[in-house]
């Protein structure tokens, strides 16, 4: 009986180790952001200088709110650290076309500017510009319609050739990957930028 209980104890310990190891692996397989890639702190205003317009290509949820959305810079004051971008939301999937104006100013850190939307009735919020290559892509977690939206935005010239490092940073920092731009659904949208 003593040999049997020792074998059972060993088997139990072995199974416990295997089960624990499997539990540790579950978050990696669940689609959650991994936050493993290294990147410098984004300087949002340096990025604003380069990115005068962009289109959302990937979103972290499937609710369709960023489908075919384009942003266009209307104003940038590098000295005062203020910017204004207009979000152009086309009529799509039962959504009425609308424009939202994002007013941005310097925030607590270079990657986290403070913003208000339209007349500012919803108060100040903070955006998190997670990654940019300072050429043609931005990964940003930004307030949109009373919730956070983690997305990959690219310039018009990169829509059909999104740099892999940008996709990698999006996948590393946002929970899911949902395409929100395709030529058929978003026909004519790029004409606005």
List PLM regions with ranges:
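A beta-rich soluble binding module of mature secreted/lumenal proteins
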Residues: 2-193
């Amino acid at each position: 009986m003593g040999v049997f209980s020792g074998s059972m104890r060993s088997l139990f310990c072995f199974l416990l180790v295997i089960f624990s190891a499997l539990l540790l692996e579950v978050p990696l397989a669940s689609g959650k952001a991994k936050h493993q890639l290294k990147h410098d702190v984004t300087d949002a205003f340096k990025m604003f200088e380069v990115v005068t317009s962009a289109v959302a290509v990937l979103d972290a949820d499937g609710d369709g709110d960023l489908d075919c959305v384009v942003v266009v810079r209307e104003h940038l004051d590098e000295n005062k650290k203020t910017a204004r971008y207009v979000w152009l939301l086309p009529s799509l999937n039962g959504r009425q076309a609308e424009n939202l104006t994002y007013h941005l100013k310097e925030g607590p850190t270079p990657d986290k500017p403070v913003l208000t939307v339209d007349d500012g009735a919803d108060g100040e919020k903070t955006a998190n510009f997670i990654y940019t290559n300072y050429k043609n892509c931005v990964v940003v977690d930004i307030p949109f319609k009373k919730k956070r939206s983690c997305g990959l935005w690219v310039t018009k010239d990169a829509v059909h050739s999104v740099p892999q490092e940008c996709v990698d940073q999006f996948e590393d920092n946002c929970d899911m990957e949902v395409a929100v731009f395709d030529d058929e659904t978003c026909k004519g949208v790029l004409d606005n930028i």
